Amino acid sequence: IYVSIFAGLVVGLILEPMPPAFIGIIAVTVSMLFKVGPAPIVDKATGVAKAITDAQAISWGLSGFSNAIVWLIFAAFMIGIGYENSGLGRRIALFLVAKLGKSSLGLGYAIAITDLVLAPFIPSNAARSGGTIYPIVSSICPMFDSYPDKNPRKIGSYLNWVALATTCVSSSIFLTGAAPNPLALELSAKSGIVAANWGTWFLAFLPVGIILFIITPLLTYVFCKPEVKGSPEIAAWAKDEYKKLGSMTRSEIFMALISVLALVLWI
């Protein structure tokens, strides 16, 4: 039964006939009903496994909701949604593009720095890239008539590869940079490996992370060289878009304060 439920879960996550979270809840619920989730308790005297009770099955099914790591991921995801809905993520991205976007290489570093700044607060590289970085990149490429099926080498390929590569680096630098990080940490702790906290994780990866972060846009520039070398128009566009945002709104200020407080408490 367990193998059937597990196989059904995998197929459901691949085909996605409904949201993945809902598929996971169905799998856990079915496991609870058939009492195949928790490991049976073996009687030391007889060596015979005891029957799993309803209480044990329910306790196993709900155990994840009391897991501190799960709540950490949930809180960070909420902060990530706040960045997108408040517009703070877009403001940060436009500011950096306006300052560094006068050349194609500088624009690549602007995208990389934006992702690095957002990484501690948005534990999903997909949400970070799709919710904040990609909308900016997709607005820049048409300015140079660069599309996936038309002139991609002008600048579009370079910018998208930088966004893809740097988000992998930033996801590794911070414990809250990607959802799998704290989960992997918990699995390590259960295996007897001393678990790191936010600060020790950051310091441990920092020497390698700095090198990777610095060379990634540069290597992408070398191996996926854009035909457009200078891009003052992009910096001007970003500056105009940034001005249209006006002063920081109440929601953006509140979001920034929450982010700083959360980061301080995580450290």
Sequence positions of predicted segments:
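Hydrophobic alpha-helical transmembrane segments
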Residues: 2-3, 7, 22-25, 70, ...
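Transmembrane alpha-helix interface/packing and boundary motifs in multi-pass membrane proteins
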Residues: 10-18, 114-124, 164-175, 265-267
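Transmembrane helix-loop junctions at the membrane interface of multipass transporters and ion channels
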Residues: 50, 54-55, 59-63, 183-200, ...
